Structure formats: C-alpha cells, structure tokens
C-alpha cells in the first residue's frame, strides 16, 4: 500500500471520528442544558452574610465601551509598565504535535488569578463603603514594606492594572479569587473584550470585618471561544451538614470550534499553614473533586480545576504534612498540574512572594489542574527577580500579591 493511500485512509477515519463525536456531543448538550439551567442559582443580596456593591456600573467605566477606551484609561494612570512575563514552552509528545498539525486538536488558554480584594488591602485614609463603626482599621493589608502604598493600593488605579494584566494575555478562560467588585467592575470591564462570566460570593467574607464588600470567586470565558452550557454555585458542607461560607463554582462550557465540552471549577481555600487548616483544605477539596467527578460523568470531554489553594504541594517541616494537593493528584479524576510543582522556594516556579514586617514568604499556592485529555503546550513563567521591587509583590509594577498563572492547552 502506498504512503498516499495510507494517509488518505487515516484522514478519512479521522473525519468519521470527528462527525460521530459532533453528533454525540450535541445530543448530550441538549440534555445538559436543561439539567444545568435548572441547577443554576443566581447571586442575590438576600443573604445577610453577603454584601455586594449596589452600583450597577463602576462610575470609572462610564462611557467605556471598547477595549481601546479601556486601554486609554489605563494609560492615563501614568504608571510604569507591568513587570514583563513570558510563556514557557512545555514538552509535547510527537503524537500531540501530529494531531495539531492534522487539525485534530484545538488550543485555548486558561488563566488563574487571585486579585487581592480591595477590602483586604485598602489604606487607612479610605472611608469603607459601610463606614468605620465597629470594624477593624485597615492598613494596606499589612504590606508595610511596599513602597508608595498610597499609589499601589489605590483601588481607582489598581483595579485598572488588574484588568491590564488580564488583557495583555487575553485568556479564553479566566478564574479569579478575592473578587469584591464583580458585577460593577470586573465583568463590565472585561465585557468590552468579549467576556461573560459567573460569580459566587463568600458568606462572612473577611472583607466585611473592615467595612467592605464581600469577596468571592468567578469564572469568565471569551464568548468567541466558548459557549456556556450551565453553571452551578455551591458551598462546602460542614461536619453537621450545614453549608459553610466558602464557595466553589462550576461552569460547563462548549468550545465553539471543536464542539468539545469543558467543565471548569474554581475555589479559594482557607489561608495559613497549619495542620488543622491543611486537614480542612484536604476535606473540602475532596468534596469539590467528588462534585466534579459527578458533574463530569458522561457530560464533559475535559475537566479543569483552578484556584488559590493557600497551600504548598509538599510537606512544610514543622508546620504541616501536605494533604490538599496530594488529594487532588490522587483522586479518581486523574488530574495533573499544568505547571511544575517545586519542592523548595529556591525553585524558579512560584506564585506568590511577599513581605510583611520581618516575614518574607515565597510559595506555590495557586494551581491549574487538568484532566489527562488536555495537553499543556506552554505556561506563563514568573517574572525575573531583577524585575521585582524590593518588597516583591504587590508593587507599583504589579497589582496583586499573587501572580497570574496561565497555560495554553490542546483540547481533544
């Protein structure tokens, strides 16, 4: 048999597979749309433990109807450029490269970003939305080593810098945490770039202690790349069966080009290293993984779990035995990390690096996990140390104490 006839048979077989896959997915998605639409729970302010901004639109976005206008407003801030970042190529198998060459796979990008809530970083001179009576005094989130804090933490500037960081990479899927201005700022700002999204606020958010709005988690997607099938907001369950104040969010998306379905989940785990906190993180992440497994069964072609887990991948001697990340990697879903998982802070990969008082911490605590059918082809590397300020993050050149992390993925 000639090479040409073999290639023709291979391509014909591949075309048949694609047609069958398309028909199967469309029949599934019609049923899924009914199920997920019934599950979806809108975010309201009826819950007294949640406080959301009353304004429909941030006044600073008035008249801003395009990405170009948004960039103009960012430029008017007169701040230095954001720290440079580059994508780092991953090793891709020969089969993966061949599938891409033959058009049998589709690429998309995903970004994970803890925004650093306004309510957890505002200055002492700023009047909180709900007043100062009975609340803790704010003090730039304890970032006392940051130079020019009155500029770095000025929300009118920092919110635009956060959007600038997102727009310079334009991810197809975006997951965020510590978002306390979703409906009034983040979503309308990113809608100018063609995004839509869903949001889940925390109950009893720590931001309330300072007189600010509740923070929460969100999933956004570029409408030109993905169509939403449905979303669901849940809260972790306590030992007594009641709902906790900590949410997680699921969104089922259909890729417009290849028609594959992607189930995305995000959450923000409890902070601070300690064994009791790590035990709680492991217990709660197992709840989320089980929910993902249930939702993904016969419904999603691929799964992604992104978030700020507030824990390292490995043991911290004298502080905690790692359980949370091992629970993810050992679960039946078979998730993998898009990024290398460093064993020490001296490794070049990290997601947060900050100074508070005499304390300096450098950790990997933000993650992008994916199912085996997805193949990362590149990931967003941390900035060079020489490009960071003495106080590391945040700074005049970076708007959060967490780096955004991002990966380009091949989708089957």
Where are these regions (language model features)?
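Short, acidic/polar
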Residues: 154-167
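Short aromatic-enriched loop/helix-cap "lid" or pocket-rim segments at secondary-structure transitions
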Residues: 121-126, 187-188, 209-214, 233, ...
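Structured beta-strand-rich core segments of catalytic domains in phosphoester-bond hydrolases
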Residues: 60-107, 113-115, 155, 173-270, ...
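Acidic, histidine-bearing metal-coordination/catalytic regions of metal-dependent phosphoesterases
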Residues: 2-12, 18-145, 187, 193, ...
């Amino acid at each position: 048999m000639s090479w040409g006839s073999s290639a023709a048979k291979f391509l014909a077989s591949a075309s048949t597979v694609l047609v069958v896959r398309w028909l199967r997915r469309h029949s599934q998605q019609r049923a899924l749309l009914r199920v997920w639409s019934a599950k979806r729970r809108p975010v309201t302010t009826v819950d007294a433990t949640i406080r959301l901004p009353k304004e429909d639109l941030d006044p600073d976005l008035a008249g801003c109807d395009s990405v170009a206008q948004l960039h103009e407003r960012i430029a008017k801030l007169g701040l230095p450029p954001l720290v440079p970042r580059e994508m780092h190529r991953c090793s891709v198998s020969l089969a993966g490269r061949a599938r891409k060459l033959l058009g049998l796979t589709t690429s998309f990008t995903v970004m994970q970003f803890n925004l650093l809530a306004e309510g957890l970083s505002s200055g002492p001179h700023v009047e909180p939305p709900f007043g100062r009576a009975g609340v803790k005094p704010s003090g730039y989130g304890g970032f006392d080593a940051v130079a020019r804090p009155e500029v770095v933490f000025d929300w009118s500037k920092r919110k635009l810098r956060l959007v600038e960081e997102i727009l310079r990479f334009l991810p197809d899927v975006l997951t965020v945490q510590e978002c306390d201005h979703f409906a009034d700022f983040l979503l309308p700002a990113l809608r100018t770039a063609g995004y839509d999204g869903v949001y889940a606020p925390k109950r009893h958010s720590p931001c309330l202690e300072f007189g600010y709005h509740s923070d929460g988690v969100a999933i956004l997607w570029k409408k030109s790349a993905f169509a939403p099938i449905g979303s669901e907001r849940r809260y972790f369950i306590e030992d007594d069966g009641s709902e906790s104040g900590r949410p997680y969010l699921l969104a089922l998306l259909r890729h417009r080009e290849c028609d594959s379905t992607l189930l995305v989940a995000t959450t923000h785990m409890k902070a601070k290293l300690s064994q009791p906190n790590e035990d709680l993180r492991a217990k709660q992440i197992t709840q989320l993984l089980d929910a993902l497994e249930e939702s993904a069964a016969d419904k999603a072609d691929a799964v992604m779990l992104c978030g700020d887990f507030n824990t390292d991948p490995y043991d911290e001697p004298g502080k905690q035995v790692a359980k949370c990340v091992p629970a993810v990697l050992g679960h039946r879903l078979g998730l993998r990390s898009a990024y290398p998982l460093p064993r020490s802070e001296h490794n070049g990969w990290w997601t947060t690096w900050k100074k508070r008082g005499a304390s300096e911490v450098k950790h990997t605590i933000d993650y992008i996990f994916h199912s085996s059918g997805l193949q990362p082809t590149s990931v967003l590397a941390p900035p060079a140390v020489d490009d960071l300020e003495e106080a590391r993050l945040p700074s005049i050149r970076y708007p959060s104490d967490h780096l955004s992390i991002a990966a380009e993925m091949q989708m089957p």
